[in-house]
Amino acid sequence: MKAKEIDGNLLKLIITNGSIKLKNQHQQINDLNVFPVPDGDTGSNMQSTMMSGVSAIRNLENQPVEAVGKALSRGLLMGARGNSGVILSQLFSGFAKSFQSLKTADAPAFIEGLKQGVQQAYGAVINPVEGTILTVAREAADKASLYATPDADIEEVLEIYLNEAKASLNRTPELLPVLKESGVVDSGGAGLIVIIEGMISALRGEVYQEEQAKAHVAKVHDIEGEVEFGYCTEFIIQLDPEKRFNKDKLVKQLTRLGDSIVVVADDEICKVHVHTKTPGDALNLGQQYGEFATLKIENMTLQHTEILLNAESSVHEEATPTPHDVFRVEAKKKYGLISVVNGDGLHAMFKEMGVDRIIDGGQTMNPSTEDILSA
């Protein structure tokens, strides 16, 4: 029987199924990644973001769609990774907002959620670029809104959305020249389609299980010349209520530092994503409004170089990789970065930031020369 409406349990099921399908296929999405930076991590970032949302709703049973949607939104925002991940979190956060005060959601509420998701995602991106996941989501939501009848079931709505999303995805190379030059479609839009396919499968009774990650040599999309991409800088600030947060001011300041800027804020936290060559300056701008809940800095030039080295040597890890490490190999560097830290928390943070070797500084924070040389 077709579902005319969904409750909290069914919402959790379809979101989980879509997320798992994306996780199982994220390497194919990585292989499409050329914009905004060809660092091969769009699929990894999107699946990591969605699985964070899944973790936030996993233990919710027999809850109204409002409660599941609210938990999903916060989980996605807190776990959002990369430009594509933050945009994806906003698509689903806006989607969930249409469920406020609802125990169940029918097709009109579902369609309204798809439209609100687009509005919220566009609002979070400082300079929206067409030919990306934004375009795919917008055109698909518009088509669902126009052609889904008031008495449609949820599966019909998603099928209309999916068909238009696929058509829109095929048009992305005409909107974004770098895609056409590389012979690919937009990776973020492709990832969104995989999620929707998984959601529809759940409504049809096909439930996916997480598959064992397989070794994979990333597909290379090289660019001519020597290019520096800078640092993918992300952080969440726990806003200080005594410090007046000014989103417009922060955005203006970040614009001077870089691009691919996404800023999302509510009454408690602010999530920032920016590509910049001066990540420290970006962190300082954020910290004026509170303290860091999380932060991540990745050298995108190094990421791209490692993908090239990986493809040339066909060297890859045999151990089960993490989403971030799935395309990472140990490459010889001219220089290595060693940090001296004290405590497991700092150790984990610096490791996440890509430090090559970490020395436990102990109480004195003064390691010997031998300690440094042997690191």
Spans of features found by a protein language model:
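N-terminal loops that bind phosphate or other acidic moieties
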Residues: 1-375
